[in-house]
């Protein structure tokens, strides 16, 4: 037997030994995986039972509070606060457990488990989401500038509007996955992206014509301004979130948003004039489109639908921002009155 063949035989025996170890490691891995699945099922079942009992207890306390004495009312209030805190703990626990997807994720992805099991994986996905928003915001800004000043073609407008549809669709999917993993983004700032997806889709279907050309430059100028504001928000919100997470005041899955939230009060109030300017520009778009819809040459259904959609965006953005500002001002006044 030649020396080369002997070396090959020795290497095969080494590989055989390593393969046996690999098989044993894989067997242990599958065993642990089954144990993990059993623990996940047990935890989910226990949480659901606890939630049901706490819900019943909360209803009982609410009924009892109506005819309780002053001392009893204080006890009921304390128990109610504890129940609310316990529900927040359950929310954090469920972020690490498999759960059924919501209707939207079921329609898009099917009944696939999107729960990430480690903090590292959750934060990596969240960070990748933030980078995606930043890169697409820059691309959309450049696209809007190009269409507004250099490329006066309907086909380039369609490419830009298609990019908007894809961007907002992707955001809604990624945000739904982040919510399933414990992100606390909620309310209007979630719905806002669904409305924006619809608006971009209607813009994409709007045929070229006199009415479209009358609104085109105004919409592209609005898109440029909106992208600039979103870039500013991302840049400053990310730094603010990093600081607040280091102080233990924010969750590691909190996201940057295209609006104003209570945690931005310290350090980011200078963004409010830009935000309100963007909100009123949406109102201006709505008014312009309502006027164009009554034009004698207007035949497109998209004009009136877009006017309503811009009005919905204005009302949602403006009222939500106004509510946050009003709440923070009231809290500051209450703190100032305390000795």
From Swiss-Prot:
Pfam families with a match to the protein in the record: TMEM120A-B (PF07851)
Signal peptide limits: none
One biological process term in Gene Ontology: fat cell differentiation
Superkingdom field: Eukaryota
Transmembrane segments: 102-124, 132-152, 159-179, 187-207, 270-290, 302-322
Keywords carried by this UniProt record: Coiled coil, Membrane, Nucleus, Transmembrane, Transmembrane helix
Cellular compartment(s): Nucleus inner membrane
InterPro entries in the record: TMEM120A/B
Membrane topology term: Multi-pass membrane protein
CC annotations in GO: nuclear inner membrane
Main location: nucleus
Coiled coil region boundaries: 1-77
Entry's family note: Belongs to the TMEM120 family.
Function: Necessary for efficient adipogenesis. Does not show ion channel activity.
Description of how the protein assembles with itself and partners: Heterooligomer with TMEM120A.
Protein name (database record): Transmembrane protein 120B
Gene: TMEM120B
